[in-house]
From Swiss-Prot:
It is found in: Secreted. Pfam families: Lipocalin (PF00061). Its main location: secreted. This is Aphrodisin. The keyword Nucleotide-binding does not apply. It comes from Cricetus cricetus. Gene3D superfamilies: 2.40.128.20. Keywords: Disulfide bond, Glycoprotein, Pyrrolidone carboxylic acid, Secreted, Signal. Residues 1-16 form the signal peptide. The modification Pyrrolidone carboxylic acid is found at residue 17. One of its GO terms (molecular function) is small molecule binding.
Amino acid sequence: MVKILLLALVFSLAHAQDFAELQGKWYTIVIAADNLEKIEEGGPLRFYFRHIDCYKNCSEMEITFYVITNNQCSKTTVIGYLKGNGTYQTQFEGNNIFQPLYITSDKIFFTNKNMDRAGQETNMIVVAGKGNALTPEENEILVQFAHEKKIPVENILNILATDTCPE
């Protein structure tokens, strides 16, 4: 498992500057959080990716997604602004600091730290893909990231099948 994680890290770092892979159509496959209430069905941070664009050498990352509230899909677009440490900052349901950690041609693993308006912090992992489920190797990487972020494994939710929002 350590070899897989090291390979994932090396691969991710090698591709970290190749932001062309980030752009395009994406779907949320898996979402995980240390505060399960935030990502359960109807939760404010249960979002369904649709599109990512990068501007100004990816110093600005635009993410379009849906949130389902009261059985209604609500389309939202946010712009994350690159900070000096490789993270992006944006506003949605409070302040968010996010970072793409692992990038392939068909998957992106993001971490996100949300500080809501009440001051509650939620650590998250969001995996976006082109529509395919995680491979066993990608699942191992996800579990390791969850351990590092102190997110219980039982809080990892496969939500691809619950995405009923428009393309």
